[in-house]
Amino acid sequence: MKRHLIAAALAAASFAAFAAGGNLRYTIQVNKFENKANWTGSWDLGDAWGTILTDQLVQSGKFIVIGEADMRGAAMAEQDLAQTGRVAGGKKTPKMGRLSPAQLLVKGAITHVQETKGAGGGFGFKGITIGGDAGSAEINITIYLVDSATGQVKASKSVIGKSGKRGLTLGYHGSALGGLTGDIGGFMKDNMGKAAMDACNQALEFLVAQLDSIPWEGSVSLVKSDKLLINRGTREGVEVGMKFDVGKVEEIVDEDTGEVLDSEMTKIGTVTVTEVKEKICYTTALEGAEKGMGVHPAK
């Protein structure tokens, strides 16, 4: 409960600058950030960071966000339970083999946390108080963007989140917060909260900036005389009028290691999107197109 309240507070303040803009999207998953700074407080810093960043990625509209490992584990457990026959069957029963894979993985570590506390306000939890009206806070984060197909780090960056200015206390008291009491309404005004928000904003900006350098591709799923069906839709940011190159894609493989070095398309033509659904789109017909051919944004 505590980390979800924190995530909601931070994401609401930062996602507006990254509103969806019709970009072609990729699936992405955030893994838990290791708390190498050994900072302790009323919330788990590594868990909270993953929750905050996952929520910000969703709110940005620029990614297809896959649930964190614990959420996917819960989904797989439900699928396993359904296979035992102990739950009612039907169209809504969870089925195996349908989890969306993550193309990109976000991993990192919290390397340093520094907090100078002032008097008044803050959070209280089991005898621990965070923040206050005065003082400052700083959080150092190292973030990695990993290609899930190869395990290679595509990009990395170190960010430093700083509280910057004095905090205010809005005040919220009561037991409904699961032990987290005090000025929860002022989390974003708390020095540690402001530092975390600043670091999250920088991390999100870094991830969005990497999109132009990551190849986007799809496949032809169905060929008819008057149209093609491609396995990408509104979920991936496809819009009516977009143009895609279609052709046979060959992978260039390192004969020594088996690593895929690159891919090359033998283009047969370009199609235009005429209709879009959530996971698929329809395009103009193309002579010579075959099911399974590759699809890239038109150059």
Question: Model-found features: residue ranges?
Answer:
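Bacterial N-terminal signal peptides that target proteins for export
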Residues: 1-8
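Hydrophobic h-region of N-terminal signal peptides that target proteins for export
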Residues: 9-19
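A structural "domain/chain start" motif
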Residues: 19-89, 94, 99-102, 152, ...
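Short hydrophobic alpha-helix segments
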Residues: 69, 157-159, 264, 271
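Surface-exposed short loop/turn segments
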Residues: 79-154, 164, 173-178, 239, ...
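Short solvent-exposed strand/turn elements
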Residues: 125-139, 236, 283-297
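Beta-strand/loop-dominated core regions that host nucleotide or nucleotide-derived cofactor-binding catalytic loops
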Residues: 245-299
